[in-house]
């Protein structure tokens, strides 16, 4: 009997909601990336998008350990010569808190077509409200050690 290989349409996708209040950014990102890829499922296949949808709320209340707020930078480039811009993570958290969380999670996903497809299942919101109540998301709690 041949080995069972799941196809993209074979998986049932769940919706998870993660509250980012006082959760360390890297721990949140690795947990969300695991759910998005489907690595928590017994039918995980690296070349198939079998993951779940993830909603992250309260992105503006994320915790960043150490002195990363002032010493870690987020870079972006306009595409023109001399168009490299950098901001500290603290500045970016004030203006666009969702972008900090999105970049951390996307950095832990594959950097190819499959990764871009998986990114579409990530929804990040700065406040406690989200428009996905109809999907009945399951609360996902990140267990963390005391800081």
Swiss-Prot record:
This protein's GO CC annotations: cytosolic large ribosomal subunit
Organism superkingdom: Bacteria
UniProt keyword Cytoplasm, yes or no: no
Any one biological process term the GO annotation gives: translation
GO molecular function: mRNA binding; structural constituent of ribosome
Keywords: Ribonucleoprotein, Ribosomal protein
UniProt KW Ribonucleoprotein keyword: yes
Pfam family name, one: Ribosomal_L13
Signal sequence extent: none
Cited InterPro entries: Ribosomal_uL13, Ribosomal_uL13_bac-type, Ribosomal_uL13_sf
Record text on subunit structure and interactions: Part of the 50S ribosomal subunit.
HAMAP family per UniProt: Ribosomal_uL13
Biological function: This protein is one of the early assembly proteins of the 50S ribosomal subunit, although it is not seen to bind rRNA by itself. It is important during the early stages of 50S assembly.
Family stated for the protein in its record: Belongs to the universal ribosomal protein uL13 family.
The name this protein goes by in its record: Large ribosomal subunit protein uL13
Name of encoding gene: rplM
